[in-house]
Amino acid sequence: MLSINDLNMDVILHLLTFLTDKNKLNFMMTCTHLYQFISCVKYNNFQLFDKIRGLSFRNNFKKIIYFKEIKERENKNTVFVLKSNRDKIPLGTTCIKTGRYFNFLEMGVIPEGIISLEFCEYFNHTLKKGHIPETVTHLTINNGFRHMEKGSIPNSVTHLIFGENFNKMIDVGVIPNSVVYLKFGRVFNQSIKNVIPHNVKYLSLMYSFNQPISEEIYIDDTLKTISYIPKSVKYFDYETSNDEFDFKILSENITYLNIIINKHIYPGDIPSSVTRLGLLSNEDVRPEAIPDNVTHLSFDLYYFGNYSLNQLIHKNITHLNLGDLSVSCDRIPNGVTHLTYNPKYLTKNSIPNSVTHLTINNKIKGSIDRCIPNSVVYLNFNGTYDNIIYKGDIPDNVRCLIFGNNFDQYIEEGAIPNSVVCLNFGKLYNKPVNNVIPNNVKNLTFGYEFNKPIENAIPNNTNHIEFGYMFNQSLKNSIPDSVTRLVFNYGLKSIYKINKKFMNNIPKTVSVILFR
């Protein structure tokens, strides 16, 4: 007489396809012979990731429910808050932040294996050599420390950040040569002479800094300017409005320059090596002052003088961000492909046909009908934009359409073209969407306030949908079978949403549900 153990493996696996996940597991746990198939079977019902994460065959589960915290624990290093020297740091911890009342550091308190370390702003103790292990690569020092001894920051540190309120004198040699990323906070205003090591590639000096960054000395009877900024620096962020700033101190190795300056800018001032330039000035910028190699320009000027934007911007610039500056529509040069600005109004042909990516940051006066060229494929109505959208406002070739957080206006039926595949409604949007979403949208995002019925509103081509915190509508017959991923931003109330009624309204095609 045959027993079940005599059945062919393919036959057993075929029989298991007719069972629910629970019955599959119960069946295979009846004997050791069947248990060997546990990693060969596919499981089709939704399971909480936290329950299956430790299983060797967890990849066999086709449908998984994630919570943000679970996913972050899986993919990121957990930060351990160290409150006292007596705290037991869990094995495997790689990131530590000292707590508010942690104010005394002894040797060995921070163990080997820590990669990221942050001292809170209340820490007020002398930092000595050996306090920080040689495994730390990322170090953040806030407004603490009576003093930092030479050698107290180990040679393993590559990224060093001084917090927003840090304003202590740093001795020569304290910052090791291993540091390549160095950022000072907004109130730092101490001398940096011989402080910055020669291997730093990224350097940031912020608002309050008003110290010399160079000096003139005689070398062989010749007066020369000596820069405190190493020639190794390639990314220089200087946002201080220091009137004594001298462009001559900038090396030809700098490729990214972001600067706030209150003086005239002449041709030759900015190094020719710069390819990305952020510039804020309330003084005159002369034509040809921007080097030919610059392709990305953020140009927030308070004062244009006698020169137009076309005179200041050369043909090699493809990415142009005008920040809060309001510029006449006809001043945008040809050749710009990525444009961000704040026009007061738009007219036909005001934006050149070279623009493919357009971000508008403010509310425009009047109609924008046929004003945006068909070359635009990415359109972002950002910031305060809050105009009604009519047919003709959005060109037919736009593929990605984003409405900013302030947008909450009606959208005329057919106003969003069928070319759009990615559609994002902003935080405040809470209007009906029936006959609004075009048929080809694959990725759809609703903001925080959206809470309208979506039955018959979602097209059959949509794959991914994200809902905001306020959404509380029925999903029954509302999610098309094309959807494979759902995201719900319910925060702490997420756990109360998982029930039989809720899950029964989820299409079988959905394989991932994320609550966050």
UniProtKB/Swiss-Prot annotation:
Coiled-coil boundaries: none
InterPro entries, A to Z: FNIP (IPR008615), STK_FNIP-Repeat (IPR051251)
Residue stretches of each FNIP repeat: 123-165, 166-208, 341-383, 385-428, 429-470
Sorted UniProt keywords: Repeat
A Pfam family assignment: FNIP
Domain F-box: residue ranges: 4-49
Protein name per Swiss-Prot or TrEMBL: Putative F-box and FNIP repeat-containing protein L414
Species of the source: Acanthamoeba polyphaga mimivirus
